[in-house]
Amino acid sequence: MIVQNVSASGVAVLNATDPNVATMASKCKGSVTFFALDRHHPIMATHLAQGHAAVYVEDGHLVAAQGKFKYYISLSQVPITLGGAISFQVENVMASVAAAWALKVDWATIEAGLASFSNDSDNAAGRFNMFKHRGATVIADYGHNPDAMSALVQAVEALPATRRSVVISGAGDRRDQDIRQQTEILGRAFDEVVMFEDQCQRGRKDGEVIALLREGLKGAPRTKESCEIYGEFIAIDKAMDKLKDGELCLILVDQVEEAMAHIAAKVAAG
């Protein structure tokens, strides 16, 4: 375990809200910096009360705190979080801040670094990259598991949209229940689901992944439209060509570089 190998003078940065991660603190020879969105989480509250370091969110700011020391960074100055609207990106940023703080990086440098974090594809391709297309919001992400779907849905629900659509395939090397669960989650948040299958099935037979995705959509409380398509780019075109002003489309890309280039070309073409 990585945490067990932290030296006595080192620091482990741990997510206080994940029980499997938080318990690693007892194995750390060095000190621990916890992070969480809520400073009142029991582990965070205890850790802070004992004078240890932690990073949390308060009134639209990231707060790095230890004892009487507090340093505030406005989330409005961290583009990748969309002003704090994207929770999973806020958590990523908190972990980054905690790590830089542990390395004694000065705060001006940390803030400058955070200001350079953005959602564009040049910064981190396939990681919640956002585009504007015909007045609609298009988001491209490489999420391929239930946890990713839950995080993406939470982020999407924080964004305004008159209608939501999603383009998805499934990684054939995942368990059946994991593939099904992805569309179960998406079916609660999207009006339309475009399912696609492409050449790389990772050991699955043709049609097998689509069938599992279809099963996951059964009884979906929100999804009223769905379709099945062979070919990633054809699926992307179908979803993007239907978009109207004020709508939102989440595209769960498979061939990251190629798909990102395809989306960018469509956006440029208008």
Question: What are the residue ranges of the model-derived segments?
Answer:
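Acidic, Mg2+-coordinating active-site environments of NTP-dependent enzymes
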Residues: M1-T137, G216-G219
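ATP-dependent carboxylate-amine ligase
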Residues: K29, I86, A98-A108, A112-G270
